[in-house]
């Protein structure tokens, strides 16, 4: 592999309040493993590690042979590193943002807009919606990872309406009846009824929400103290969210949204307009390069209930359908590929057996090119390189090719490394 170039990156850490504290955070551990000078404060949260070129977290290049630049600046000056297809498709920019998240307390009830809505929201309120790009994203668990994702089957929601009168009261009798009747109707009737119920909940008066939530918390707490299980109404989760966000309407969202607990390596893909919330655990997250989020609960940040209720996809599905399983590479037994139906990124997980060191960057680049999409097509890939001690994130973007003018850029997380191969790429089996 000719003319390879390797240089380290300093990647941005976001210390949002919901992050895990100090060295309990995988984000903090990755930061410390890559920077011997990093000082980890045990009383501060380390929520997200950003690897990419987004303006809010553009990685910095650490190389004495290169004048001080961010990764975004360097790519702007060296666009051929993306490969011609990615360069042309995404206007010479890195199309994805890769993160590691360490979640201690719940993130907001949220969704991300499609491209058309993102442009509209950015034009109307750039202070709240800083990007004009869509934000499809994938979360892959590093540890046991809990989250809410997509609307539950209507049958489950109707069951909660029966068992949780406080929930039923906020929805209202008319909307609840409409939802029950939709169970024997067509898909459009279900979508309409679900939209009506969810909108009624999210637009409930604050005073009524607090009253009903306090009643529900008291009832669950009494039953738990008496030794009774409240699992059938997600009692433990309700108490947990209420403790984190007292009186918040988002606590009731658990009765609308699927609850998923991902095992390490399991993933969920969140396309545009899918409601979701991360609750607890560590994950890697890859997304289109955007920071647009429409929120409506479980957050002290700006909420936009009208936009969220209008934009959401109200198609219900069982929780198992929200899982996004990887496919095994046919050419390499160590690779698993998470390939969502968007052009912005693909995630590849490499599990290295034996030893505890990472495989070489050059060999990983070879594997990336060998397992990328068909010749001539753009690809944007994220690799998770597993060893005995830690999973190391490693990013690639480029073009699957047989031409000498194509290229591969790789951005490493755990090792903060960029590999650049500007002249040629290996062929399968090389």
Regions found by a protein language model. Name each.
Residues 107, 137-147, 280-301, 345, ...:
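A short hydrophobic beta-strand segment most commonly corresponding to one strand
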Residues 186-307:
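Contiguous mid-protein beta-loop-alpha structural module that forms a pocket-lining wall or clamp
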Residues 59-65, 71-94, 150-153, 244-263, ...:
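A short beta-strand-loop-beta hairpin characteristic of the jelly-roll/cupin
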Residues 40, 377, 412-430:
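Intrinsically disordered, low-complexity basic segments at termini and long loops, enriched
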Residues 330-334, 346-364:
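Conserved short histidine dyad/triad with adjacent acidic residue
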Residues 1-227, 300-327, 333, 347-349:
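Transition-metal
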């Amino acid at each position: 592999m000719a003319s390879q170039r390797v240089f380290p990156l300093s990647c941005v850490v976001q210390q949002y309040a919901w992050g895990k504290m100090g060295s309990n955070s995988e984000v903090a551990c990755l930061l410390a493993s890559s920077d011997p000078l990093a000082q980890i404060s045990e009383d501060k949260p380390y929520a997200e590690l950003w690897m990419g070129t987004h303006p809010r977290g553009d990685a910095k290049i650490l190389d004495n042979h290169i004048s001080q630049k961010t990764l975004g600046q360097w790519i702007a000056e060296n666009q051929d590193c993306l490969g011609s297809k990615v360069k042309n498709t995404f206007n010479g920019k890195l199309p994805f943002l890769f993160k590691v998240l360490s979640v201690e307390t719940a993130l907001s009830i949220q969704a991300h807009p499609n491209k058309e809505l993102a442009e509209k929201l950015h034009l109307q309120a750039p202070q709240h919606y800083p990007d004009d790009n869509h934000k499809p994203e994938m979360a892959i668990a590093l540890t046991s990872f809990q989250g809410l994702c997509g609307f539950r089957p209507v049958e489950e929601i109707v069951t909660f309406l029966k068992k949780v009168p406080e929930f039923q009261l906020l929805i209202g009798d008319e909307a609840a009846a409409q939802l029950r009747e939709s169970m024997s109707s067509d898909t459009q009737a279900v979508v309409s009824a679900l939209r009506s119920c969810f909108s009624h909940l999210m637009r409930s008066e604050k005073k009524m929400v607090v009253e009903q939530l306090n009643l529900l918390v008291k009832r669950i707490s009494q039953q738990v103290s008496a030794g009774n299980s409240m699992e059938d109404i997600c009692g433990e989760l309700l108490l947990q969210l209420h403790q984190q966000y007292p009186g918040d309407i988002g606590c009731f969202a658990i009765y609308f949204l699927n609850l998923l607990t991902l095992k390490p390596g399991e993933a969920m893909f969140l396309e545009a307009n899918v409601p979701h919330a991360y609750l607890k655990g560590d994950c890697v997250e890859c997304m289109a390069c955007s920071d647009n989020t429409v929120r409506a609960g479980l957050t002290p940040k700006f909420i936009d209930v009208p936009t969220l209720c209008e934009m959401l996809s109200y198609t219900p599905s069982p929780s198992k359908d929200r899982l996004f399983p990887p496919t095994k590479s046919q050419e390499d037994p160590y690779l698993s590929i998470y390939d969502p139906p968007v052009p912005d990124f693909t995630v590849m997980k490499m599990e290295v057996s034996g030893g505890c060191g990472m495989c070489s960057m050059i060999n990983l680049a070879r594997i990336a090119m060998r397992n990328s999409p068909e010749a001539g097509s753009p690809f944007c890939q994220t690799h998770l390189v597993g060893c005995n001690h830690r999973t190391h994130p490693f990013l690639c973007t480029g073009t699957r090719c047989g031409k000498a003018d194509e290229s591969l850029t790789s951005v490493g997380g755990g090792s903060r490394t960029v590999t650049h191969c500007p002249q040629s790429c290996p062929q399968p089996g090389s």
